[in-house]
Amino acid sequence: MTDASTTSRPLFNRQQLISLFLPLVAEQALSISIGLADTLMVSSVGEAAVSGVSLVDSFNVLMIQLLSALATGGAVVASQYIGHREPKRAKASAAQIMFIMISLSVVTAVIVSVGRHAILRGIFGSIDADVMRYAETYFLLSALSYPFIGVYNAGAALFRAQGNSKISMLSSLVMNVVNIGGNAILIYGFGMGVMGAATASLVSRMIACFTVMFLLQKPDCALRIDHLTDLKPDLDLIKRILKVGIPAGIENGMFQIGKLSVSSLTSTLGTAAIAANAVAGNISSFLNVPASAVGIGALTVVGQCLGAGEKVQAKRYSRLLLLTAYAGDWLMNLSGLFFLNKLALSWFNLSPEAYGMALELMVWFNAVSLILWPSSFTLPNILRAAGDAAFTMTVSVISMWVFRVAFCYLMVLKFHCGLLFIWMGMFLDWAMRSLFFCVRFVRGRWMEQKVI
């Protein structure tokens, strides 16, 4: 790949960017809806059920983030090969990310299915018997869905690498329709409670997986896998994918392990605190959907620019994407402050104590997100698109453990503070991440990395 920066015509016009990012916003909203729908509809069973589902979902996020990190590695490599006009290598990288994803997700599903009780006890310690019963039920079926989530994430990432985000959006739409419809039938119709929610999620993820794989095999797909023999390991491509995927996986994994460590603190504060934390977490995820979507799309835009050797365009698009992320974040979080928070919380069957806790958390979240969220989470994806994953990993891991986990344990165990201070630790982590990522971006060293 050439290192020269050129000033040729723009690689992406306005219509192409809109066509990429609008479906991504919809896809992210739909993706988050699965966890939110489960929590919302399970709330009719009671706070113990909500708490059980939320504890498992915190672990599920860890697994999904690890799988997504590997998909990110594949997307970055494929994007840069597309930008560099090497279609055969791009297709080969698609086959290798599928090989990696299938292997890892199947092994993970088996381990978690067999050891789910020990995992829950090890992470969350002593929790109410009802909460544990619900959690074990939800955990088993969640684990069975990991291979389908993994393959779906890989397929969706490959479509986005081509600049086609409509496929993953439509697949996510189908997944959510099946999930919500299944929840309604199994929870309300058959009274299956948590088991019904978990079953609906499993079936919906299976359908999304098969849909993406079918579309990936169409003749007009630039990254299709033509033969099963294409899945034969290619050590050179695996190394290139893992160069981005492993640091991203360690970053996401350690980030989620840190969150799990903090969740174990939350579980000591009582069922109301667990429920408030779960509901506020789900709602807050929705508020950052636009900025999150921009970060995902940045892997395609910045990756293709750098693959084509267009460093000037890469930096220009990066600034535009970051400003877009801030605009979306301000729109959503100001709406939350003025009316969305109370409206969303009213949908959940929370006790007055849990409702009050959740509302307080949301107000703080809105205020801090306006300043810190895009620079903490959208900006590092821009750096990863250039292959600068080792830097983002180092900053994220150190910041998580030093500023979030240590702070939370100190405030809760030493000073006996409540749930709000656990979220304060999260905000402190964001501030540190933002500082280092912004400095890295301004100095431009992130564009000196070599992926292909």
Give each language-model segment a name.
Residues S8-L40, S44-V45, V61-G73, S105-A109, ...:
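N-terminal transmembrane alpha-helices
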Residues A71, L141-R160, S168-N176, A197-V212, ...:
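Short runs within selected transmembrane alpha-helices of multi-pass transporters and secretion channels
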Residues L62-Q65, N179-N183, C209-M213, F286-V289, ...:
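Hydrophobic transmembrane alpha-helices of multi-pass small-molecule transporters
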Residues M1-L24, A78-S145, G189-I246, V302-S369, ...:
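Short alpha-helical transmembrane segments in multi-pass integral membrane proteins
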Residues V50-V110, I149-S168, I274-L340, W373-V395:
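Small-residue-rich hydrophobic transmembrane alpha-helices
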Residues E47-S58, A135, F139, A198, ...:
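Small-residue hotspots at the loop-to-helix junctions and early N-terminal turns
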Residues A29-S51, L120-A129, I185-M192, G253-F286, ...:
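Helix-terminus/linker motif at the lipid-water interface of multi-pass membrane proteins
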Residues S19-G35, L141, M175, S204-A208, ...:
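Transmembrane helical elements of multi-pass membrane transporters/channels
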